[in-house]
């Protein structure tokens, strides 16, 4: 049984849109990585010590919390935002990217 092929056969439009969103997400991640580098997540450490990993993941959690609070405010205002490029969709993509970044940190892959 191939769940991916089965899913794509049953839900072709949904599968295609999901892949488009993943591409948008990756493009945003890549452009932000070129701006920020890895240091903003590793906080100056090599992330080889479990305590450094825990500290980094806690920082990611705090960033996600900020995005969730931003989403809450945006949704209360029916999506009206005051910062260009920081709307509801952008916030959801940021949260999703932070989730992947946390996994990369925890899997010891957050490096060049």
Pin down the residues of each PLM region:
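Intrinsically disordered, low-complexity regulatory regions
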Residues: 1-112
């Amino acid at each position: 049984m191939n769940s991916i092929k089965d899913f794509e056969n049953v839900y072709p439009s949904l599968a295609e849109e999901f892949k488009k969103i993943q591409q948008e997400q990756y493009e945003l991640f890549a452009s932000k990585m070129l701006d920020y580098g890895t240091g903003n997540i590793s906080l100056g450490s090599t992330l080889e010590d479990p305590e450094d990993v825990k500290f980094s993941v806690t920082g990611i959690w705090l960033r996600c919390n900020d995005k969730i609070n931003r989403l809450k405010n945006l949704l209360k205002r029916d999506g009206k935002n005051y910062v260009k490029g920081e709307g509801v969709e952008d916030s959801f993509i940021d949260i999703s990217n932070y989730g992947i970044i946390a996994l990369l940190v925890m899997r010891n892959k957050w490096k060049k």
